Amino acid sequence: MEHHKPLLPTSSHAAPTSSTRKDLLFVLCGLLFLSSLVAYGGYRASGVPHAHLSSPTSNHQQDHQSPTSLPSSKWYPVSRGVSSGVSEKSSNLLFAGEGGASEAFPWDNSMLSWQRTSFHFQPEKNWMNDPNGPMYYKGWYHFFYQYNPNGAVWGDIVWGHAVSRDMIHWLHLPLAMVADQWYDKQGVWTGSATILPNGEIIMLYTGSTNESVQVQNLAYPADPSDPLLLDWIKHTGNPVLVPPPGIGAKDFRDPTTAWLTSEGKWRITIGSKLNKTGIALVYDTEDFKTYELKEGLLRAVPGTGMWECVDFFPVSKKNGNGLDTSVNGAEVKHVMKVSLDDDRHDYYAIGTYDDNKVLFTPDDVKNDVGVGLRYDYGIFYASKTFYDQNKDRRILWGWIGESDSEYADVTKGWASVQSIPRTVRLDTKTGSNLLQWPVDEVESLRLRSDEFKSLKAKPGSVVSLDIETATQLDVVAEFEIDTESLEKTAESNEEFTCSSSGGAAQRGALGPFGLLVLADEGLSEYTPVYFYVIKGRNGNLRTSFCSDQSRSSQANDVRKQIFGSVVPVLKGEKFSLRMLVDHSIVESFAQGGRTCVTSRVYPTKAIYGAARLFLFNNATEATVTASLKVWQMNSAFIRPFPFNPDQKS
């Protein structure tokens, strides 16, 4: 059926945030200070520590943070993580319901049960955040993650562990590492794996000591012949790195995968800050036990604040194949990614890496690290890539947090999931951005499909798509604006951003148009994923790709934002999108993955069999032609590993 009426505006929208650029003088002074300290030959972790650390015999003891029980329907903002020296881990601190409401929505068990995903990775219960140390080893994909075994809120962080043959179906293993040493007493935090040429595995991770100092530690498999890597040994000489002079005790975390230098040494980078300037410290090592702090920084950007979960890797300029982290040369670009502690988004820049100068230089300073491009313009943070030597590709994982209330998370007993793993490669058509795309293996979950060819959507119309259910979907769609509309539409200097536009209800001559997902029949709840096109003064089209959650739920204790950004659409290309819908998660990819948006959606009516999918066109002038293929998606097999009696239980 077709509704010939435009989408209605909503009452309020979240205001966008911005970061202020600071003077570079402080950074230069800080660099001079750091350089003077290492000029004599480099700081070595085996020397005298420059941060106060308590030994294993210290009497200093601190209790673990325990999950908070919320027995009533009253809920209040609670900060988690900041006091310990990491980014805010509670969405409650960021909002208090619409209109400042402190009463939680009366969620029932049916609603909360529906929110749990069916083919995204998550533990059986409790809290999860950053992906850690992903790798392919002896026939298994290994995935480690930040995990609280004691509740559905951040705290008591250890390393969870799971394995898979295809990164879709997962088997949970026993915890890999727990907080049992003085140097990680307050948490076994984020880390990365490096596989050496001889097959040896090196795992570096951040530990929060019994005095909340962030230090770097070394671990390795107890039995390298074990394909499941069940047991891990922590190096007896931990910590191998402590904060250098001038760096705060809580501003030194998340070591990267190591890469080989031209001198044959291994090199890592670690995120930090000087005042409000984000920086990446660089260390060289030959044995992963003793390190040299290199003079200068890999990159520093004023105004970006603390850099978490730094990632650094090469991409090919010629094809889509992945590259080992150590590859460099004329046919290679490098990608530097940082997770900004201040706004909890993942930013990346593409540029060149000088091995001798230990310096990354972005191709476009306007798209520098932390101020330009993002991996994902929705809820996607603390991401980590790895080189998959099994299929010659680079794989990206990202943490998808919750945007409901902590009360609801505690009630349902779990919080957070991981994104569907994505392949990452350079967009060789533009040369200025990455392409992200769900791994091919996810297509093994496709069931029956419905195809819709050349559907016409007139201005201000909503068209129902007749499919079975709309809770677990893989949708591929293409859209075209009729030529007559493009030619007669006046050129405009209209300013448009997804986050401040008013959402899908904001009508323009050439947009918005796209899909309404997780919608109920009466459209009291719906989430638009759409394109908005502006014809500029020179006749060129400027396209934005957005996801609008402002009418996604009737609940008052969920965050309803509008996400998105500009997406390049090249001459001759149709507007294209792909969506993975998995209950409360919608992952959207525009133009082959040039721009990606992940949303958390918590409907109260558009659930189970009541969920619908619609085509919509809220433009005032353009008629849109759409062609879609919609697959129902099966559930992934995610369960505990079926150990034999002689295996670890």
From Swiss-Prot:
The keyword Protein transport does not apply. Substrate binds at W127, M128, N129, D130, Q146, W154, W189, T190, R253, D254, E308, D341. GO terms for molecular function: beta-fructofuranosidase activity. It is found in: Membrane; Vacuole lumen. It comes from the Eukaryota. The chain crosses the membrane at residues 23-43. Belongs to the glycosyl hydrolase 32 family. Residues 1-101 form a propeptide. PANTHER family: BETA-FRUCTOFURANOSIDASE, INSOLUBLE ISOENZYME CWINV1-RELATED. Possible role in the continued mobilization of sucrose to sink organs. It holds the Pfam family INV_N. Glycans are attached at N210, N275, N618. Induction: Regulation of synthesis appears to be related to the growth of seedlings. Its EC number is 3.2.1.26. The keyword Glycoprotein applies. The gene is INVA. GO terms for cellular component: membrane; vacuolar lumen. It is a single-pass type II membrane protein. This is Acid beta-fructofuranosidase. The active site is at D130. Keywords: Disulfide bond, Glycoprotein, Glycosidase, Hydrolase, Membrane, Signal-anchor, Transmembrane, Transmembrane helix, Vacuole, Zymogen. Pathway: Glycan biosynthesis; sucrose metabolism. It is an enzyme of class 3 (hydrolase).
